[in-house]
Amino acid sequence: MGQLKGLPVEDGFRMPGEYEPHIGCFMIWPERPDNWRLGGKPAQQNYKEVAVAISNFEPVTMFVSPNQYKNARKELPDTIRVIEMSNDDAWIRDYGPSFLVDDKGDMRGVDWGFNAWGGLLDGLYFPWDKDNQIAKKVCELERIDYYSQKDFILEGCSIHVDGEGTLVTTEECLLSEGRNPNLTKIEIEQTLKKYFHAQKVIWLKHGFYLDETNGHVDNIFNFVAPGEVVLSWTDNKSDPQYEISRECYDILANKTDAKGRTFIIHKLHCPDPVLITQTESEGVEAINGTFPRQAGDRLAASYVNYYTANGAIIFPLFDDPKDKDAQELLEKLYPDRKIVGIKAREILLGGGNIHCITQHLPDKSTIRE
């Protein structure tokens, strides 16, 4: 167990699709008062509901700061493992390890650099050093060897893979000045190919409208299966989201994946604009250097930000009539999985959603034929 030399692509490791079997799921308990209102109490209930829902299908581990351990242990059922781990916030998809597998049944991790979505240029908080240590800690906890790429800034929510050589990301995020400004698009793509074993990288221009992470791909796009994808959509041409989604659709419709397949694209309509209320804004402590939560600001509400569990899809609800439409489409797309909706407004208020707060651990014993 320890840090590896070499490259995953040379060692025969790939990043599996999220729909491939899992060993379990990791999460981090929310608490910071300058991002979560009322000291994180409402968000903790949403996180609890997500964790419990996932735990019905695969084991869940909740990491929690020392100050919150007793509270989290009391709130969460015994079926959920609770482990102390210092952190700066609760978005493990972004700074947890990227897990890789090979066809021999082995697993490895990648420890990327993290700078709170843009560092001192346009990051969302400072410091972020505790978050930047989590990937290594998780690999050591699970006794997984890992590659260290600390000089390359990458969040897990900024990429999606199909497990068969295709990776999708956005230019808005990976080419942002606050991440890897000294690297060209070609150099960034080469790194993605070397570490995820991707044969083809598809670049969307933008992520979801007003996504404060510079347009993470997981809020606008997801793989349902190899060659089949889902895209956040609106028919409202006066909504800025329309042009973004249309542009993404046109790019995908004119691309093939690494296997040469034309994409089957499903449109998952987003809810009507979700705005921060005055009460919600007042519940967040205003601290210099953190992203403000102002009454009337629009949130990046998207049903595409869901978690694919063993035998289930855990997706966000927004108290919108389109909740039902999203449920029905997901049931059609995933006939062999149970579709579970969770009220997720408090997660959304923090800047992300269900996919952002979860990190799956692939089942390394599943060898692809």
Swiss-Prot record:
Region forming the signal peptide: none
EC number of the protein: 3.5.3.12
Organism: Listeria monocytogenes serovar 1/2a (strain ATCC BAA-679 / EGD-e)
GO terms, biological process: putrescine biosynthetic process
PANTHER family (alphabetical): AGMATINE DEIMINASE-RELATED (PTHR31377:SF0)
Pfam family, one: PAD_porph
GO MF terms, alphabetically ordered: agmatine deiminase activity; protein-arginine deiminase activity
Keywords: Hydrolase
Full protein name: Putative agmatine deiminase 2
InterPro entries assigned to the protein according to its UniProt record, in alphabetical order: Agmatine_deiminase (IPR017754), Peptidyl-Arg-deiminase_porph (IPR007466)
UniProt-listed SUPFAM superfamilies: Pentein
Active site: C356 (amidino-cysteine intermediate)
Family the UniProt entry places it in: Belongs to the agmatine deiminase family.
Reactions listed under catalytic activity: agmatine + H2O = N-carbamoylputrescine + NH4(+)
Taxonomic lineage from the root: Bacteria, Bacillati, Bacillota, Bacilli, Bacillales
